[in-house]
């Protein structure tokens, strides 16, 4: 267990059609509890990677900045991931991230503006997410380790490669692909997703063949449960779980089953790992069969894409090692 996930808030200023997270009725994690989570992760479990999730983490900017600054005191915190829809980013935040040595900034942007706006709808007077993020792209170019997450729901599966190319054309080159999990997919949409991934594969291979940079995070991540993360998960109420499956509104009743402790009563590493091993069984039992089978099907397509890219990635890595200026 080498990952700490702090769910700092469930609040969000977007209502994405495909997002399962419950947005209302929950507290946000206090800065004190966020720091306690970091201390516990390092002192009891040895540290590793820290991830800040929501909701939208930048809805509680003082917690995010404070806990990131707190993490700097620990050499055993190797990377700090901030996942955001981008609406909270401004010049001040980008300057902070530009000088934060451990940061990986992950921004959700699904492709062309029409698809982004169809599925990622602002609420509460929030601006358009596409316009806001694209308006920052020149400033983002000087922020180290910016990753774009492209979510692909069923209705855009046929345009997955087109949307990916659009993001590349905007100047981004680090990506994370996220097919729509825990929603039903018709078989023809899964076929379209496969074709879309084939198109993305061709774009990636073409860039590598030309010596151009392109990083796909999916090549380096392996989770036992599709979409959801495992590790030491501190929820907004300071309870501790081995997975963040309880973020989903349709799965929140599993929180009682996945809870292994709290910041006041922390679990052992063994307790977290034992409970983590049961998550897929809980999901299969809880979810409608069509939804679970759809999730496995789209995850298999993503796995197929990654496996098809590994040989070329090895060759590209060898080339970059010969030319250090190309290293990501």
Predicted feature descriptions by range:
Residues 4, 34-51, 60-179:
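Radical SAM/AdoMet-radical enzyme domain recognition
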Residues 25-29, 56, 124-125:
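Pocket-edge positions in alpha/beta enzyme catalytic cores
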Residues 23, 54, 179:
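Residues that line or immediately flank small-molecule/substrate-binding pockets and catalytic motifs
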Residues 40-55, 320-328:
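Short Fe-S-cluster ligation motifs
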Residues 7, 114, 118-134, 138, ...:
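Radical SAM enzyme [4Fe-4S]-AdoMet core and its adjacent flexible, acidic
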Residues 2-32, 44:
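Canonical Radical SAM [4Fe-4S] cluster-binding loop centered on the CxxxCxxC motif
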Residues 16, 61, 242-244:
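Activation segment
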Residues 247-328:
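Flexible mid-to-C-terminal extensions adjoining Fe-S/redox cofactors in radical SAM and related proteins
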């Amino acid at each position: 267990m080498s990952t700490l996930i702090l769910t700092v808030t469930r609040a969000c200023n977007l209502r994405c059609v495909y997002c399962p997270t419950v947005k209302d009725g929950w507290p946000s994690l206090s800065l004190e509890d966020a720091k306690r989570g970091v201390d516990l992760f390092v002192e009891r479990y040895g540290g590793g990677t820290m991830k800040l999730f929501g909701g939208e983490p930048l809805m509680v900017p003082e917690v995010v900045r404070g806990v990131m600054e707190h993490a700097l005191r620990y050499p055993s915190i190797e990377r700090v991931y901030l996942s955001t829809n981008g609406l909270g980013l401004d010049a001040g935040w980008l300057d902070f991230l530009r000088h934060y040595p451990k940061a990986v900034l992950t921004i959700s942007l699904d492709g062309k503006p029409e698809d982004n706006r169809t599925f990622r709808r602002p609420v509460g007077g929030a601006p358009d997410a596409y316009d806001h993020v694209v308006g920052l792209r020149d400033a983002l170019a000087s922020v180290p380790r910016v990753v774009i997450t492209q979510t692909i729901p069923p209705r855009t599966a046929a345009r997955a490669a087109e949307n990916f190319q659009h993001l590349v054309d905007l100047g981004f080159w680090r990506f994370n692909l996220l097919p729509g999990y825990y929603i039903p997919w018709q078989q023809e949409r899964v076929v379209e997703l496969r074709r879309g991934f084939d198109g993305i594969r061709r774009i990636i291979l073409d860039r590598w063949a030309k010596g151009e940079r392109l990083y796909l995070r999916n090549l380096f991540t392996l989770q036992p449960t599709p979409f959801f993360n495992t590790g030491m998960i501190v929820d907004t109420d300071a309870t501790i779980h081995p997975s963040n499956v309880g973020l989903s509104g349709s799965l929140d009743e599993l929180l009682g089953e996945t809870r292994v402790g709290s910041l006041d009563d922390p679990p052992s590493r063994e307790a977290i790992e034992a409970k983590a091993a049961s998550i897929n069984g809980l999901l299969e039992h809880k979810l409608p069969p069509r939804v679970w089978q759809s999730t496995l099907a789209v995850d298999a397509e993503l796995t197929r894409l990654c496996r098809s890219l590994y040989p070329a990635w090895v060759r590209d890595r060898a080339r970059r090692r010969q030319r250090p200026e190309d290293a990501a």
